A protein has these predicted regions:
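Conserved hydrolase catalytic core segment
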Residues: 266-306
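Flexible "cap/lid" loop of the alpha/beta hydrolase fold
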Residues: 296-325
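Membrane-embedded alpha-helical segments of integral membrane proteins
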Residues: 89-137
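Conserved serine/cysteine hydrolase catalytic core
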Residues: 334-403, 425
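Catalytic active-site module of serine/aspartate enzymes centered on a nucleophile-bearing elbow/loop
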Residues: 6-28, 396-437
Length: 437
């Protein structure tokens, strides 16, 4: 073999070895980026479903941020120790998210403060994302890294934009303006929202269902019933425009009692509850029997029903955080109000449900006080019809009506079906009037 050929072959082998040696740290760098980001995601999920499951929105959000901070910190540390292209810039998002997360968990701000912070964190997060992109581009060690990092940057940017839009929409949407005649009444440390229309006695009090606010009952039912008597739609604590209070040990019956007294709403009352609201109606009737002249249960839950949310209830606490970045708006009806508020209401009701079902179970009979049970005829879960039949036995004066083509929600949301709910309420009002002479 000629010397030139041997020299050429040696040069080729040397280049191949050099290329392979160069690709090894590049592959290692890509693995570190991917594994660090994945570790951050896994840590966030573990914190949310583990030690902080079922926590308040501020705690859940803080746990997620701490998990993400772990991922960015790993990227900064491992890239410095194990690669020739250290990603020291990752220490900045790690520190920012760790500080924000720890602050949320320690201070545990309420919904009002989190809403106010909605004007602050989206632009800060967007600025951080831009800064991260600029510095990450300078430290790229392979063509693989951009495909690993840029989707993460994109998700963070979308969260910032979504959070900003959600805050702006909640503050400016004319459809969410306060309805004339709505009052905020102090019931002892917090205020409840109530709006009464119509005239006459007995007064009808509308109890919204699971995750619902007074607006749901006031859309079709309240105006119809107002033609017959006085009707009041109110928001329980933490719902609609009412102030939030800790869910643990919350006494809804006491709140309503004080609200009606301080708002100068005269009794006796016909309490009409939809879904979970039916359980609040029964609890109130048990606690203040002399004030309740009649009850209407609109496809109500049953005190002894299986709690379908018992298993995932603690995991549902992540919903308000997702709503805060605009995800709930994608799946919600714009007419129903603020998705962020709805999400918090839903989680609060789910957490309160076991205690509320137990309180409702204390009422074993309404005696001869008129009762109307309205049942949706479609899309009901197994055993629902039997539970509705059992509710109808609570009074010796009962009307049980099934709306064949109605669903659980259409009894209050569909105009035609809501009219039948309104009719059932008005019928009980007339029955009470006949009894009182």
């Amino acid at each position: 073999m000629q010397p030139d050929a041997v020299s050429y072959q040696g040069e080729v082998v040397t280049r191949r070895r050099a290329g392979a040696a160069q690709r090894r740290p590049q592959r290692r760098s890509a693995v570190i980026v991917a594994s660090s980001l994945l570790a951050g995601l896994v840590t966030a999920i573990a914190l949310v479903v583990g030690p902080f499951a079922g926590g308040r929105e501020s705690v859940i959000t803080g746990a997620i941020l701490l998990g993400f901070a772990v991922g960015w910190a790993l990227l900064a540390v491992l890239s410095v120790r194990l690669t020739d292209r250290p990603q020291r810039w990752a220490a900045v998002p790690a520190a920012a998210m760790a500080i924000a997360g720890a602050g949320l968990m320690v201070l545990a701000p309420g919904v009002a403060v989190l809403t106010a912070l909605g004007w602050v964190w989206p632009p800060l997060l967007l600025a951080l994302v831009v800064w991260m992109i600029v510095h990450a581009r300078r430290r790229q060690s392979s063509r693989v890294q951009p495909w690993l990092l840029y989707p993460v940057f994109g998700v963070l940017a979308l969260a910032a934009v979504g959070g900003g839009y959600e805050t702006l929409r909640n503050a400016t949407d004319p459809a969410l303006a306060q309805v004339a005649g709505t009052r905020l009444v102090d019931v002892g440390g917090h205020r409840l929202s109530i709006r009464c229309t119509g005239s006459g006695s007995p007064t009808v009090v509308l109890e919204p269902g699971l995750g619902e606010s007074a607006a749901a009952m006031a859309r079709w039912i309240a105006p119809d019933v107002a033609r017959t008597t006085t009707v009041c739609a109110y928001d329980r604590a933490g719902h609609g425009r009412s102030d939030a209070v800790p869910a643990n040990g919350y006494d809804a019956a006491r709140d309503l009692h004080v609200l009606l007294k301080r708002a100068h709403v005269p009794g006796p009352y016909v309490i009409a509850g939809h879904s979970l609201g039916g359980m609040f109606a029964l609890s109130y009737a048990h606690r203040y029997p002399a004030q309740v002249a009649g009850v209407v249960l609109l496809d109500s839950m049953h005190p002894h029903q299986d709690n379908a949310f018992a298993g995932p209830a603690r995991l549902l606490a992540v919903i308000p955080t997702l709503a805060r970045i605009g995800l709930a708006r994608v799946f919600s009806d714009p007419k129903d109000g603020k998705p962020t508020t709805q999400a918090a209401q839903f989680v609060r009701d789910v957490n309160e449900m076991p205690a509320q079902l137990n309180r409702a179970a204390n009422l074993t009979s309404l005696g001869d006080r008129p009762l109307s049970v309205v049942t949706a005829g479609t899309d009901s879960p197994a055993g629902w019809t039997a539970e509705q039949n059992d509710l109808a036995t609570l009074s010796s004066i009962t009307v049980h009506h099934t709306v064949a083509d109605a669903t659980h929600t259409s009894l209050i949301e569909d105009k035609r079906h809501a009219a039948q709910s309104s009719q059932a309420i008005s019928d009980i009002v007339r029955a009470v009037r006949r009894r009182s002479g």
